Amino acid sequence: PLRVALGDSLMWRKNRFATPRRTRLVEGGDELMAERAANQRPNTELLRQQALAALPGDGRLLIQADGQVKVVSPQVLGRLHIHEPSPLGDEPSPARLILPIEPPPKLLAISAGGRVAAVRWEFAGQQPGSLERFLPTGLEGDPVISIEPLPQGDCSNLSLGLLSSDGRFKRLPLSEVLDLSGRATSVVKLKEGISVRAAMICQTGSDLVLISDIGRILKLPIQDDSLPLMGRLAQGPMTMRLFPGEQLVGGVSLMATTSILIATSQGRIGRIDASLLRRCQRGDFGEMAVRLEQQNDKIQTICKGDGLVGVITSQKRHGRLDANSYPCINPGEPCSDQLDLNTNETLSNLIPLLQDNQN
């Protein structure tokens, strides 16, 4: 048959022209060659260490609200005046974080989709750029809502808190995210249409403050019986039950601060002493944080009430204010101050500045 003839012909050609094998077949040789090639390539951790060693010892890590990541000298930082109060205008984007690079800080980026990843900021010394360049590709298209510095020492009483838009709050042991690889990791299971609204480092025994757009505020103790620690696949318990049309704005973990700053869409600012708020249980009604005097004005954002706070408006104007300069009001009172906004301009966000060893 033709098949037998072709086989005999190929076998004759192999015996006539083929060269004898000069290497020895080794079981698993393909895997060994791949491992050897990988070891010869510089890995990400080695490149990160080399980039860190090339940075000046007195450098400062600067991350702005628009996502720009830079390593600058103290002299350049002083000329920018980005850590000083300023009125609304054509100012640079507010600073979100200013930290010394010695000791090297560990930064955790949390996305709206409930994923976390380490920020490889060390590469910003030679090539500054947008935050996306220093994050794994797994976060591409998933907006980062928070950047949290991880502690250097004991973190047994610390946890990562995630507040979702449906009013659920989940605490994850911080030890589970300290040693992240170069990939993004999912830390919360979200239903369709639900996103992470706020993320924060929580300390056991402190308080959590949540607020909605109508001004309803809820203060919860961060304890295992009220806000238990959960695994990565859990959604977290319901904390604030929302009325029809009511939306959750955000939350603040009160660790080293005792006051909160609240801003409305029309630019009204109120600072409240958090110790005056009563502690509640999950699902409670809570109390009214401020009295909104206009029907179309709603709570836009909340942040800690001390230190420097950046301001961003709908017309892309920027400013910086000193939260400590605002007097504290009692819960339920009108906001004490008004930002100088243009016609048809609204407040978009408040960006608290994290610097040095602030929490």
Feature map (PLM): residue ranges:
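Short, structured "edge-of-domain" segments at secondary-structure transitions
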Residues: 1-359
